[in-house]
Design a protein with these regions (language model features):
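A short, aliphatic-rich alpha-helical micro-motif
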Residues: 135, 193, 259-260, 280-283
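Structured core elements
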Residues: 76, 116-118, 142, 199-200, ...
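ADP-ribose/adenylate-binding Rossmann-like module
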Residues: 142-145, 169, 267-292
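N-terminal ligand-binding/catalytic initiation module
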Residues: 4-166
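Short acidic loop-to-helix transition motifs that present clustered carboxylates
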Residues: 121-127, 148-151, 171-175, 232, ...
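A generic local secondary-structure boundary/capping motif
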Residues: 63-68, 131, 188-189, 213-216, ...
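Short gly/ser/thr-rich secondary-structure transition/capping motifs
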Residues: 56-61, 246-252, 271-274
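Glycine-rich phosphate/diphosphate-binding loop of Rossmann-like nucleotide-binding domains
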Residues: 85, 92-110, 162, 168, ...
Length: 292
């Protein structure tokens, strides 16, 4: 706790953020050569006529693209901007700063090169076909900030038709770190994972993925209450899509105020400020809260 107090989150103004993105070169990424480009020979090897040798080799064995190109260490960071974290549907080009940001995180923490690609479409099949058609250039696909349920459709189809890894960050990235935090919090507060009661506010991609991973670790489905804009997702509620129906439970609770009573864990995956002080008081002793 003392260490957490020392590592206070710094806050920045919109002006500072805009200046950061516009300083020196605009944006956050650039492409540089991994080979020397100082002599005429270097240029000839890098382009014509030198490229002919790897081109012919790859044409005979496509897997050699992993040896002679950047494919094996190149990820496509893809979005249509339909569910930008904390901002909603602002369109493809508006999501570009986020995708560039993810690209620099890949480079900074894993030395993985990546290119951001913003697809201006809200048609899942159109997005799937676009990714399919350029996927051969990449070693992996990172999907991000695509609204549910389209993100589920897109990910499922791509995993079926592509021969490279497909990772939906909002689902799996969020679920992995949240589940790790939950396991630690349960250990610290001496709780039994099979007995804890969890309330998840939000029913998008990240919420559903977290719920699924919680269940795989031992949390009973009946102990997880999920809410969307209309309230608690309960069995028998009209208008639920196929994905939300999988998380419906038998409960008399219809609102967050009702569902939070006696809860051990609150996970906020919608907008900030939903969980009020009065609600926290209704939770169990030493509640575990993941919220902004």
């Amino acid at each position: 706790l003392n260490q957490m107090k020392k590592n206070k989150i710094e806050h920045y103004s919109d002006k500072e953020a805009l200046e950061f993105h516009n300083s020196n070169k605009s944006g956050k990424i650039e492409i540089i050569s991994s080979k020397p480009m100082t002599t005429k020979r270097d240029l000839a090897l890098a382009y014509s006529p030198g490229v002919a040798a790897p081109v012919k080799a790859i044409s005979q064995d496509p897997d050699l693209a992993y040896d002679y190109t950047t494919k094996g260490n190149l990820v496509a960071v893809i979005s249509n901007g339909s569910a930008i974290l904390g901002l909603g549907n602002l369109g493809a080009i508006a999501s570009k700063p986020v995708m560039e940001g993810k690209a620099v995180l890949f480079k900074r923490f894993a030395d993985i090169d990546s290119i951001d690609l913003e697809i201006d479409s809200n048609d899942p099949e159109e997005i799937i076909n676009s990714i399919k058609n350029f996927s051969k250039s990449f070693g992996g696909i990172n999907l991000e900030d695509i609204a549910a349920p389209d993100c589920f459709i897109i990910e499922k189809k791509l995993k079926k038709i592509l021969d490279i890894p497909v990772f939906h960050d909002d689902q799996h990235g969020t679920a992995i770190i949240t589940t790790a935090a939950l396991i630690n919090a349960i250990h610290i507060t001496k709780r039994d994972i099979k007995k804890i009661k969890i309330v998840i506010n939000g029913a998008g991609a990240s919420a559903m993925a977290c719920a699924d991973l919680f269940k795989s670790k031992g949390v009973p489905q009946k102990n997880i209450t999920m809410l969307d804009r209309q309230g608690v997702i309960y069995k028998g509620r009209k208008g639920l899509n196929d994905w939300k129906s999988l998380h419906a439970i038998e409960t008399k609770s219809r609102s967050l105020n009702e569902a939070i009573k006696g809860a051990d864990v609150f996970l906020g995956l919608s907008k900030a400020g939903i969980l009020k002080k009065e609600m926290v008081k209704k939770m169990s002793k030493n509640p575990i809260i993941f919220a902004c």
